């Protein structure tokens, strides 16, 4: 991709997933301030011709959630040495938790009073994970997640229920993306509801 009308850059492509995950874990985002950067000035277009790139390669922003939590976000296409670094780290007054999709079967947990993080390997004792992994050490992969997502969608349709994420969630994620883009242009905090 080289232009916004082709779908956008790193923020839309990668950032949308971590925004949705953050909203799921921490709640609605109130306001953002951010920057978008274009580090690669030209790319091959779909016809293999070099074309000026108008999209972001890297987007960094700070978000304030409605519950008072502050989060730092980054989406980048050109982080070399990392294949799938979609993840989060949440720290609080009594500990912290880390997740990275490259190691999607593990969580790292830090509890106050202990030195360092402990690794928790998901297994049969962690519901509903055990439905897919009958014994410790048998892990889910990315393609397994896609099968689970399709199953959730079909179950929701069969039971006349809404599954998550839905179109309303996608719209709310897009509002955050639009606010980051506006903040990058105007160089100031943007409230999500002001769009």
Language model segments and positions:
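Predominantly a Rossmann-like dinucleotide-binding segment in NAD(P)-dependent oxidoreductases
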Residues: 1-53, 107, 187
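A general structural signal for well-ordered alpha-helical segments in protein cores
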Residues: 18-19, 147-151, 177
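Glycine-rich phosphate/pyrophosphate-binding beta-alpha loops
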Residues: 74-83
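Conserved loop-to-helix N-cap of the C-terminal "lid" that shapes the substrate pocket in Rossmann-like
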Residues: 11-15, 164-170
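C-terminal glycine/acidic-rich active-site capping loop/insertion
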Residues: 41-67, 88-89, 94-168, 190-195
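Solvent-exposed beta-strand sheet faces enriched in polar/charged residues
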Residues: 33-35, 74, 193
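Short arginine-rich
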Residues: 176-186
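Beta-strand scaffold of nucleotide-dependent catalytic cores
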Residues: 72-75, 99-100
């Amino acid at each position: 991709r080289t232009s916004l009308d082709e779908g956008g850059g790193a923020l839309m492509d990668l950032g949308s997933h971590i925004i949705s995950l953050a909203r799921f874990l921490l709640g609605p985002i109130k306001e953002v301030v951010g920057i978008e950067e274009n580090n690669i000035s030209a790319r091959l277009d779909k016809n293999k011709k070099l074309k000026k790139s108008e999209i972001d390669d890297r987007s960094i922003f700070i978000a304030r959630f409605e519950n008072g939590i502050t989060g730092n976000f980054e989406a980048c296409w050109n982080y070399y040495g990392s294949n799938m670094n979609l993840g989060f780290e949440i720290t609080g007054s009594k500990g912290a938790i880390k997740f990275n999709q490259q190691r999607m079967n593990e969580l790292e947990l830090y509890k106050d009073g202990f030195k360092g993080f402990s690794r928790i390997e998901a297994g049969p004792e962690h519901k509903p994970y055990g439905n897919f992994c009958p014994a410790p050490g048998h892990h889910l992969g990315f393609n397994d997640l896609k099968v689970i997502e399709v199953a959730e969608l079909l179950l929701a349709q069969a039971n006349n229920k809404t599954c998550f994420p839905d179109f309303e969630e996608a719209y709310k994620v897009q509002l955050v993306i639009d606010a980051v883009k506006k903040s990058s242009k105007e160089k100031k905090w943007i409230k999500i509801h002001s769009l």
